[in-house]
Amino acid sequence: MTNRISRLKTALFANTRQISLERALLYTASHRQTEGEPVIMRRAKATAYILEHVEISIRDEELIAGNRTVKPRAGIMSPEMDPYWLLKELDQFPTRPQDRFAISEEDKRIYREELFPYWEKRSMKDFINGQMTDEVKAATSTQIFSINQTDKGQGHIIIDYPRLLNHGLGELVAQMQQHCQQQPENHFYQAALLLLEASQKHILRYAELAETMAASCTDGPRREELLTIAEISRHNAEHKPQTFWQACQLFWYMNIILQYESNASSLSLGRFDQYMLPFYQASLTQGEDPAFLKELLESLWVKCNDIVLLRSTSSARYFAGFPTGYTALLGGLTENGRSAVNVLSFLCLDAYQSVQLPQPNLGVRTNALIDTPFLMKTAETIRLGTGIPQIFNDEVVVPAFLNRGVSLEDARDYSVVGCVELSIPGRTYGLHDIAMFNLLKVMEICLHENEGNAALTYEGLLEQIRAKISHYITLMVEGSNICDIGHRDWAPVPLLSSFISDCLEKGRDITDGGARYNFSGVQGIGIANLSDSLHALKGMIFDQQRLSFDELLSVLKANFTTPEGEKVRARLINRFEKYGNDIDEVDNISAELLRHYCKEVEKYQNPRGGYFTPGSYTVSAHVPLGSVVGATPDGRFAGEQLADGGLSPMLGQDAQGPTAVLKSVSKLDNTLLSNGTLLNVKFTPATLEGEAGLRKLADFLRAFTQLKLQHIQFNVVNADTLREAQQRPQDYAGLVVRVAGYSAFFVELSKEIQDDIIRRTAHQL
């Protein structure tokens, strides 16, 4: 890492995060002027107004220009989506348990007196709440399932970066002008053209700023850098990039512009090493210093950490630690099925090893063709302990997409949005994080409904759980589709849609079914606790008959505080096998019930003509979802978290080592989980030391690939180090750990999430 990159990192985190009202005020100012116009035009004009008037800056020593806010890591508001939680939490932002922000008293006054009164009763949230039935509201209030993305843009998408970079904005504007001439009544084309032209003007604002700064700059080398930024910006406003610097700059400008449009999480980066390779090679051919090109890439990686998302307190519990979702996958397959690893794949990992920040959320695609040098580079990066890169298995993911009707060529081109959500870059609008389903809560409901049922059998209980899962999936689909329609009718994204295949041919926004692939992704959470509970209940009640069902239910209701409660809990934990130890009897329960969940989910369609797709990952939702579930037959206390990750074993229950964990997860039908899965594994640093340690990790990754698991990620850290960081956070400000599908600064996490990471089993190889 160069001195410049070190200083850029330090400057990014030097000050307290603040909330900026600028986007909200500009958006609102435009919206007041467009009453009566089509929603998509109002949205486009508001975004264009932001691009024209928002304050811009180029910070000291930056090589890549473009900042969403002048102050680093500031949160922005989108009251047009949901003004109510913002009003409720204005005074809580600086002191809340997770993801704190400072906000001035004057900004609070402006929000209360100017912004909120305008958006009250005219936001997307008002529409969604008005459409939700009482039954759906009841289910969400008890957290049987949650409906997400009701308060901001959907995001969770990858634009067609090759189209942007290989054609350039000038050519794209010309194409959109033709569409407008052919169909002048089509508001989507008009809105997209307006925003493409506004994007050009916004980029030219940076060119002018760089020239102004250069004119007064007394540092010769910095003056030349500013003039180069100006030249690149003027070129990018009209022409396709020719060099790596130009490509990185246009790539970042578009990321910032799309943030203004929707204020969404997980506008992810796709297969960065594939579409950026021609520009990297062109710069090398032109004689650029490879060390400078690496510094450019490191600059871009640092920039990815400047965008943080302002979430509600409850949402921050589900998505703790600013998982912005700048996710990129490296390696994988070409469209012809050959290995896609290239020199830029290695450089992306090298640059990350220098920077070691939570974003970008890099991942590596493994397959039978992956070569040893790249696998070892991957293992070397994992060993650093930041949880990056995560690993995805082509041998599972490609068939999973084929099973959903995706073409083979497109399936081989898959990438990931957000945390682990599987998507086809530039061709999918997948609503990948639309809902989370609490499987353990459903079991709890069934247990209580059978109180006093002397005729209850284990098979009868299983059948009731299946039926109840099916019932609540129906309600989850209903709520998800209302949210889907809300985004269509209230929050179209015409600029983003112009970079998604088939939207231009159809003349429709992604929210209106314009994309080639239209999924709705919903996560089943708690499968480890569910199978552990049912296996223990079957053994204790129906096989060994040590307690009656009602006696066990009484112990659970009392949270194991009855005279025999602790003894019962110890037996439930220690005498019955647990998922994650390669024991068929309990693993098969997981496989059967998760398959039932998947097959039920995939029955349903969304308003865009696509189908629902199941996944199993938690982000950090295993903590709040566990807080609403009472004591369970796996020995879990009332309110205790669920198993982390999605497919990970419950904390402390994976006693047979990491290979046994792999074998347990391999018994699940990973191909059905086409919205993504998540498996956390924690290693002690000592087990990966030296060349031998790297080889062991590489062999473990090959076993993961051969066993046909879909995903795995790692923490490599001692629990003692984490405990010290809790006690002396000022000494561990740069400590990055893996949460669930993303990495975060350990000291920025709430204590409940910190404790969760500390308690995870640390394995040895």
Residue map of PLM features:
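Extended non-globular scaffold/tether segments
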Residues: Q190-K201
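A conserved hydrophobic secondary-structure block that centers on an alpha-helix together
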Residues: A214-C217, P221
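Conserved catalytic cores of very large enzyme subunits
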Residues: T2-Y189, P221, E225-L765
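Extended amphipathic alpha-helical scaffold segments
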Residues: I203-E211, D273-L277
